[in-house]
Amino acid sequence: MKLLHTGTHFRRLVARPATVAVLTVGLLAAAPQFSSSVSAKASAPSCTTPVTSAPTGRATVSTKSTEFGTVLSVGSGALSGCSLYLITSDELHSLTFGLAAFACSDGPNPIGQPCDTVLWPALLTKGAPIAGPGVKRNLLGTLTRTDVLSGESVQQVTYAGLPLYRFFQDESAEETDGANLFDPVTSPSGTWYLVDPGRGNPAPGRLQMASEKVSGSKVLAATMDNDFSLLPGGSFPVYTLSNKNGQACQTYCALLWPPVLTSGQPEAGNGVAQHALGVVVRPDGTRQVTYKGKPLYLFIEDAYIPGVTGTQSINGAGAVTPWGTFNTIPLS
């Protein structure tokens, strides 16, 4: 697959729970093309290979250099070099001490393909995983899953506590097509990121901010191009938080209002002054984009399907939450 090399690295499938009806129509309309793509890729011995059986040996995790920086990859075997990803909504499993399900499982979804075996194949292991070059052994771990292979008990590799996956559109070890991709197939919804080996944090690359017209208003938005999508990518409005320094949104809050992340300085797009953009380091070490000193957030119910009239909207403006009030940023 040919990669789009732009200054933007937020790549997503655009959809949210608020637009599930429209989303389902759009996905089902594209289902034949999507299903045939999965079937064709499943037979190729590449990073697209689905999980079909329990592992027979120990998995190795290594690192590689990409446009997003140094990230985790499969370290040995036929899948050596394939990009590895985490999904942010798996944090809910940790925050609820295992009561909440993992976001990516083999359960039903609108696309009709199992998330953790076909779309985002889980990295499985038999025994403790092996730390390759650049990987911190103390951050490697495993967890037991019974929702990956139709009830069979298997061990999935984790890094800094979060499960690791491949992406079925990464046809070769050079590809990172799943980076920064919002996934409506998972439940709860979340964003897929490459993984920084230093702390196990997301490795988002450099984010672009631009002025976009949403629901008749020009607002500051995060540009989210996606070179893999059933539909074209677009932009999502961003929000500031009304509390003293705008940084009160952590843990549960961040699952509903994901921080806008970047690796390095964000890029100013159309209608945005570069000097107004900055970064602040969050408690987990990730770099959050700021505008005029205020940290920026997304809202999980703001997704839309480009080209489908009436689906693009601003749903979080003025939302009063336990952490403060969220507001968009009007631009002229």
Put a short name on every predicted segment:
Residues 40-332:
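Compact beta-sheet-dominated domain cores in extracellular/mature segments
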Residues 2-39:
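Secretory targeting and sorting signals
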